[in-house]
Amino acid sequence: MLVAMNGFIDWGCLPNFNSPAVFSSILDKKKGGYFAIYPTDTHDLYVDQYYKELTNILVTEFIKNGKVILRTTDFMPDSEYGKISFPEVHRFVETFSDPVRITIDFKPAFNYATERPLIQRVQHGFIFSTEKENMGISTEFQLKKNADHVFADVDMEPRSSSWVIALYGIHHLYRPTDYKSYLRLQETTDYWRKWASNSTYSGMYHSMVMRSALALKVLFYEPTGMMVAAPTASLPEAIGGERNWDYRYTWIRDTAYVIEALATIGYKREAVSFLYDMMDVISRENKIRTIYSIDNSDDFVERELDFEGYRGSRPVRIGNKAVDQLQIDQYGSIVRAIHAMEKAGGVVNSYLWDFVEEMMAKIEYLWKYPDSSIWEFRTEPKQYVYSKVMSWAAFDSAITMARDLGLTAPIKKWKGIQDEIWNDVMTKGFDPQTNSFVQYYGSKNVDASLLRLPILGFIPANDERFIGTMKRIEDELMVDGYLFRRYREDDGLKGDEGSFLMLTFWYIEDLILMKRLKAARAALESIIEKANHLGLYSEEIDEKTGDFLGNFPQALSHLGIIRVAPKLEEAFLKRVSKINE
C-alpha cells in the first residue's frame, strides 16, 4: 500500500503484491481506485508524515495554524504468525482541540479498474463485489453511495476518534469495534519492534539502516518467503517516458544482495530462510529464470493497461518480458548467494552442493555466449563484461566453498575455467588506450556495472586498471552529487532515465575498498539526504529536481544502505584501532 501525504491510499494490490491492483489512482486519477481520509478544507494545510518508531505503522498529521487538527494512523495487521494473511487496512482517525470536518472517500476499482463492481449498502458499511472479488468498508460514519464510490463529509467533535476499516475478500461486515483494531494495532506494533530488536547493528547511520531493514522486511511475501523488488508497477523512470516496468517479482540476482545485507545486521535466520525458499522454487521448476513470481502463479505476460500513467507516463505495463531473456550473470548470482548463505551460518547440504555443481556445469557452457546481462537490454545480446565477471565470481565462490567445507569438486578444472574467463576479460574487455574496462567486447564505452569488479574480487580496487575505469565512470556517468547513470549506450528504448541509486552504493563500496573513507562518508551522507520524508528510496532519482523515479520503495536501494553503512563503520573502526596501536 502507498499512502500519499494528502491522505489517499493511491496504490494497493490485494490480497497479494502481485494481485491486480484494487487501488491504482497513482496511475490514473479518474479510473484508478483509492481510499481517502482528509480534512475537507485543505486551505493553508500543512502535512507531516512519519512511522511510529521501529515499525511500518504510518502516521499522517494534518496541521493548520501550527496545530495538528487531524491525525490518521494506518496499518495492515501483522503478527509473529506472518504466514496468516490479513488483507485489511485499518485507519484510526482522531481530532484534537478543534472540531474538524473530514472527508472519507472509498473507491476500490477491481482488476486494474476494468471491472465495475456491484455496490451494496449493508449494516455497518458497504460491500463492493464483482464475480471474483469482494471488498468492504466498515465504519461508524454514515457513508453515501455516488456512482462508483462511497463517501461522507463528517463533522468530528474535538478530541474524538474513530476507526475506518477496509477488508478484502469478505461477504459481510461487522461493527468496527468487532474488528478489535486497537488490539491489532498493539499486536502489529509489538511485532515490528520485536523484529527490529533482533538487529545486531548499532553503528553509524543506525536509524537509516533500520528504516531500510523495515522497508525490506515488508517486501517479503511470508507464505512463500519470496521478496518483490518493489510493490509497484509502471512508476516511470522518466516522466512522460516509456520506461515503465512491473517490479512485483523476485529477481534472482537480488538473492545474494538480500542474504549478505540481512546477515550483516544480524538477521541470519531470515537470510538463510530466504535462500532455502528461493531454492525450493528453483527445484520445483527444475530451471533458473531471471525472475520468479512470489506465489508460483507464473503470470509474466507483459501487457499494457488503458491508464493515463503517472504524470502522463505511458504505456502502463504489467507483467515483465525480462523472464524470457538470457542473463548469464544470474547463474553467478545464485552461486554467490549460496556462498553468502554459508558464510551467514547456513548449511550447504548434499542437495545444495549438487545444485552448485549443476550451476557450474551450466556456467562452463554459457559464459562465452552473448546475453542481455544485468541491465536487461532489449536490443541484440552482446558479450557483456559484467556477465563474464559474474561467471568468474561463481567459480571463485564454488572453489572457496569446496576448499573450506571439504566438499568433493573438480577444483583444478574449475580453477582452469576461472583463469580462462579472467584472461578473456583482460584481453577483450579491457581497453589499454583508455586504461579502463568496457561495457562489452568491442565497445569503447563504460557502464556502471563495472563498479562491481572489486566488490566481486575480480580485481583489487587500487589496481591501476580499475582506477582508470572508475575515473571514466566518474567523468562520463556521474551526473551530480554522487549520482550515476547506468550507461550511455543506446538500449532500444525512447527517452531518458534517472540516476540509479544502487550505483552510488556500489561506488561507496569501492571507495571503502580503496580506503578513501572520507570520500565514502561524504557520498553516503549525500545519498542519505536524498531519502524522502519517511527515509525511503525509489529505484532512481532525477538529479535536476530531486524527484524520485521508478518503482517505490525499491529493495535494491535499501539493500545498498544496509550493506555500506556497516562496511564504512568497520573500516573507520579498523583505522582508529591502527592509530591506537
From Swiss-Prot:
Temperature-activity note from the record: Optimum temperature is 50 degrees Celsius.
Pathway: Glycan degradation; trehalose degradation; D-glucose from alpha,alpha-trehalose: step 1/1
Regulation: Inhibited by validamycin A.
Sorted UniProt keywords: Carbohydrate metabolism, Glycosidase, Hydrolase
Gene Ontology biological process terms from the UniProt entry: trehalose catabolic process
Keyword Cell inner membrane: no
Annotated Pfam families: Glyco_hydro_15 (PF00723), TREH_N (PF19291)
InterPro entries: 6-hairpin_glycosidase_sf (IPR008928), 6hp_glycosidase-like_sf (IPR012341), GH15-like (IPR011613), Trehalase-like_N (IPR045582)
Field pH dependence: Optimum pH is 3.7. Active within a narrow range of acidic pH values (pH 3.2 to 3.9).
Catalyses which reaction(s): alpha,alpha-trehalose + H2O = alpha-D-glucose + beta-D-glucose
Domain of life: Archaea
Coiled-coil stretches: none
GO MF, one example: alpha,alpha-trehalase activity
Enzyme Commission number: 3.2.1.28
Function: Catalyzes the hydrolysis of alpha,alpha-trehalose into two molecules of D-glucose.
Quaternary state and interactors: Monomer.
Family under the similarity heading: Belongs to the glycosyl hydrolase 15 family.
Protein name: Trehalase
Annotated organism of origin: Thermoplasma acidophilum (strain ATCC 25905 / DSM 1728 / JCM 9062 / NBRC 15155 / AMRC-C165)
